Amino acid sequence: MKHMPRKMYSCDFETTTKVEDCRVWAYGYMNIEDHSEYKIGNSLDEFMAWVLKVQADLYFHNLKFDGSFIINWLERNGFKWSADGLPNTYNTIISRMGQWYMIDICLGYKGKRKIHTVIYDSLKKLPFPVKKIAQDFKLTVKKGDIDYHKERPVGYKITPEEYAYIKNDIQIIAEALLIQFKQGLDRMTAGSDSLKGFKDIITTKKFKKVFPTLSLGLDKEVRKAYRGGFTWLNDRFKGKEIGEGMVFDINSAYPAQMYSRLLPYGEPIVFEGKYVWDEDYPLHIQHIRCEFELKEGYIPTIQIKQSLFYKGNEYLKSSGGEIADLWLSNVDLELMKEHYDLYNVEYISGLKFKATTGLFKDFIDKWSYIKTTSYGAIKQLAKLMLNSLYGKFASNPDVTGKVPYLKENGALGFRLGEEEYKDPVYTPMGVFITAWGRYTTITAAQACYDRIIYCDTDSIHLTGTKIPDVIKDIVHPKKLGYWEHESTFKRAKYLRQKTYIQDIYMKRVRGYLVQGSPDDYTDIKFSVKCAGMTDKIKEEVTFENFKVGFSRKMKPKAVQVPGGVVLVDSVFTIKGGGSGGGSGGGSGLNDFFEAQKIEWHEGGGSGGGSGGGSGLNDFFEAQKIEWHEGHHHHHHHHHH
């Protein structure tokens, strides 16, 4: 007889903030399918006793934080890490970039059946802060917040207010997850849910045929052509106060490319030398060596990562006397030839692909329809489904993870686990979707060359207040792939990528603030965009003090200490940046880290190199969050 499906719970800890006394002072859990079954208590031992007997699936929002307390407890209570599912051991999925996905605690076996409780990260399924989930999903949310710095000795009695907040937090996640599960979205991450939904539509059989599993060797070559979004500040405006201007962004930029552009499928054919046109294999990735100089009046589009000679986040005006070695999709190569003069070009080899349009049509039609005809939770889920798919195609097959252990000082440390690989999904798709995204943004920006201030992935910022001719026929607030006129500003100042301020024209309509224009506004909204800056620090920013070197000691930094994790205030400084940098698509995750603004210092070197686009990677790029864990390369880690 098949046993009952496992129960699922939403859980949360409240913890002390002292390095020398780091512990859980409150826990809460709530049954995701029956909100009347919940408990809030003040002892981690009591919580863990429940965990060990409940044999359920638990969800914490931001497992990296709460999970650190759990593993501290397990290590101190006779449990050892093991990948083999032995009794009284626990296993983890923690990527080498320090992304936490799972803790699986094994108590033993009943016959063949494993007796275990598994803990997941709801943040991977709903990549937003709890308050934003409550807003977007139209769930009730308690006003106010817990006072995190209040003295709370061991055995502290939870106040009625605190009790209410904890209950509210676990209930929001419980409600949101229940809606997801009811939609059949039961995978470990939003990206996996999205890929599963896509496979359901085109069928697994067709998926395998259209997107064959490439060898790790081929995948590695294709991946060299994978890049993130185009994020570039025009030197002409750097650090200067600018007058009126406007911002446009593409509605659902990546889904729009997936909907209409020519995209690769099938097994590639390897070729030597230069690609020769082949109507059966119209797309290609070319390995070239060359020197290059930017043409007069053109935006730079080439960025070289992992090189000794070039800054990884700068768009280059010249190869600077070195011979550049590049792997480029034909989309990027054509753009490069249009923007640069190339010298001493050597075409080495490449891969060519069959291509088609419309593979994603049914999937995007389905979820776009749901998005436009729903509100609240279902609308948000539809957005998540649409925006999480492209990143999955380029998931990194190297899933070597981290293994936790207790260090001499009693805090958690992490060592690299054994090398581990999984099958790639279909990286060429990721390469071309992101390439078409860059192409769309860069061609629009180039057509407005005399006005372009800044680009970020799917947006262009221009001087002046007239809609440029080049996009005037494709401006629309909602249509897929059209440019939305996002805002008009009175003045602005840009320091580097993802670091700018604007005074935006707003008008009050029936009590709400909506976008205004120079001839029609009632309010000016001061907007601060600055990767890694907390809301508290943003309140300190003015047009006068917003410059390179601006610094405040107010940024919470997460540190592993005996017992768990504490947040300590560290210094946040605006550093002088290059004129460009790869960052990636929207992915909701950005917003989450925007909201959290937490750096993790976990010993080891000073943080990894940065990879190409892939949902997660690029948003780390975007956030400039340093997770100091001393290993290179960004990874996308997905098991189930």
Question: Which positions does each model-derived feature cover?
Answer:
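Conserved acidic
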Residues: 1-7, 19-591
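Thr-biased low-complexity repeat/linker tracts and other Thr-enriched repetitive architectures
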Residues: 579, 583, 587-602, 606, ...
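Histidine-centered metal-binding segments
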Residues: 628-640
